Amino acid sequence: IDQFISSSETKWNRWNGLVMLLPHGYEGQGPEHSNARPERYLQLCADYNLFVCNVTTPANFFHMMRRQLKSPFRKPLIVMSPKSMLRHPLCVSSMDDLENGSFQETIGDTYANPAKVKKVLLCTGKLYYELLEKQQKDNRNDVAIIRIEQLHPFPQTQIDAHLAKYKKAKVYWVQEEPFNMGGWTFMLRMYKGNNPLEVIARESSASPSTGFSKIH
């Protein structure tokens, strides 16, 4: 990965359209089945060398793969996604979503009331559905959830467009991974928004996750 996938264009002026589908998501299955080490791929990102995505809808997955072939250039695509998304009842798309549109680097909140929002949660991947269920169960229309479907190249312009609706809100990066893993250090480096960014994460850990589902 270091020798060729992330640096082939910089080193040898060679395009590389490889797609890596990496199982990633905290589902209580232990450290070997929970974490694909996204922080290590994000550390390699520079000069638009990689696409790193963690999508939340079938339509966006389709458009992501379609973009990979339709683009007039080639870049490696790193995809983080858990198996549970295949059967999640909320992870569905209409035929119209599949037939029309294009890949969305970010997806905004359609439930929260912009006039009431006090907190904005930035997240990626399946964690969105857990946050969504809690948001709707507690009727929290004062909390907005923004999905970062593509981490690199970093979609700062799209994020700014979403945050413009919530100018007085506090902004948090929320992740399932421990503080020293996941996308937090990458967000610290890349996020340039007007709203200061805070983090909600598990405590730092030497292991990606616990092996006990009850503790998880």
Predicted features and spans:
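Thiamine diphosphate
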Residues: 1-15, 23-39, 63, 71-74, 87-216
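Glycine-rich, charged/polar anion/phosphate-binding loops
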Residues: 5-6, 61-66, 105-109, 158-159
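Generic secondary-structure signature for well-ordered alpha-helical cores
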Residues: 6-10, 43-47, 66, 70, ...
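Generic detector of short, locally flexible boundary/turn motifs and exposed helical patches
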Residues: 18-20, 42-46, 82-83, 135-141
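General beta-strand structural signal in soluble alpha/beta enzymes
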Residues: 20-22, 52-56, 79-81, 173
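Conserved thiamine diphosphate
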Residues: 24-71
